[in-house]
C-alpha cells in the first residue's frame, strides 16, 4: 500500500518542526534526505545528512523537473527529489515534510500521479496571542524579529483555507496526539 505524503505548514513558533521530528523519532514517518549546494559541515556525510550537489548539477536537476520542491536560502540551494519521495511512498512509508506555504502550493501543484495520490496537507494554526507568547518565550529573537514573525504569521494564516486540514495548536502533547491521529486516519484512505 502506498504511504502518505503529509505536508505540514504553519508560522514560526507553531511547533510544526517538533511534530515532524517526533513522528520520525517514534517511527511513524520516514526521513527524506534533501539536496543542497552548500558545503558539508564537519561530520556531515553525503547521502546521510544531505545529498551535496554542485550548483551546476542542482540547476540541471531543476531544469529536468526532478525536484518536488526547491528554494534558495542564504545563497545556497536546497530541494527534495521527487524520486526519493516516490521511493519511500511506494515502500509504504509515510513521509512528512515541514514546508512553508509557498512550498506547499508548489507541491500541491505537482502533476506526478504517485505524489497526487499520496498527498495530504495540514496547517498548524496558533491563535495570535499564544503565538506571540511562544515567540517571546524562546528568548532568542530581538523585538523587530518577533514583530516580523508575527506579520509573516498573519500572512500565512490568511492561506490556511488552501489546506485540507487545520490543527489549532493547544499544547505539545495534545497537538502531537491529534497529529498522529491524522496520520493514522490518512493511512486508512481507500483512494491510495
Each predicted region: which residue ranges?
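Short hydrophobic/aromatic beta-strand immediately N-terminal to the Walker A/P-loop
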Residues: 5-7
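P-loop (Walker A) phosphate-binding loop of NTP-binding proteins
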Residues: 9-11
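ATP-binding Walker
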Residues: 14
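Walker A/P-loop
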Residues: 17
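Post-Walker A helix-loop "phosphate-sensing" segment adjacent to the P-loop in P-loop NTPases
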Residues: 25-34
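ATP-dependent small-molecule kinase phosphotransfer cores
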Residues: 36-95, 101-102
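Conserved phosphate-donor/acceptor-positioning beta-strand/loop module used by diverse small-molecule
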Residues: 94-101, 114-138, 168
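NTP-dependent small-molecule kinase module
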Residues: 133, 139-141, 155-192
Amino acid at each position: 500500500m502506498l504511504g502518505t505524503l503529509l505536508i505540514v505548514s504553519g508560522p514560526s513558533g507553531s511547533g510544526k518542526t517538533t511534530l515532524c521530528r517526533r513522528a520520525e523519532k517514534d517511527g511513524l514517518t520516514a526521513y527524506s534526505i534533501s539536496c543542497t549546494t552548500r558545503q558539508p559541515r564537519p561530520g556531515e556525510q553525503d547521502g546521510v545528512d544531505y545529498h551535496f550537489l554542485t550548483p551546476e548539477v542542482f540547476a540541471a536537476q531543476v531544469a529536468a523537473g526532478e525536484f518536488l520542491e526547491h528554494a534558495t536560502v542564504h545563497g545556497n540551494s536546497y530541494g527534495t527529489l521527487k524520486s526519493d519521495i516516490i521511493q519511500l511512498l511506494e515502500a509504504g512509508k509515510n513521509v512528512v515534510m515541514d514546508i512553508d506555504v509557498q512550498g506547499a502550493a508548489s507541491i500541491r501543484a505537482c502533476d506526478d500521479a504517485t505524489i497526487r495520490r499520496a498527498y495530504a496537507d495540514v496547517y498548524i494554526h496558533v491563535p495570535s496571542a499564544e503565538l506571540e507568547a511562544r515567540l517571546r518565550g524562546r528568548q532568542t529573537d530581538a523585538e523587530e524579529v518577533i514583530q516580523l514573525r508575527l506579520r509573516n504569521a498573519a500572512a500565512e494564516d490568511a492561506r490556511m483555507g488552501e489546506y485540507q486540514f487545520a490543527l489549532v495548536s493547544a499544547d505539545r502533547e495534545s497537538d502531537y496526539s491529534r497529529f498522529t491521529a491524522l496520520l493514522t486516519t490518512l493511512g486508512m484512505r481507500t483512494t491510495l
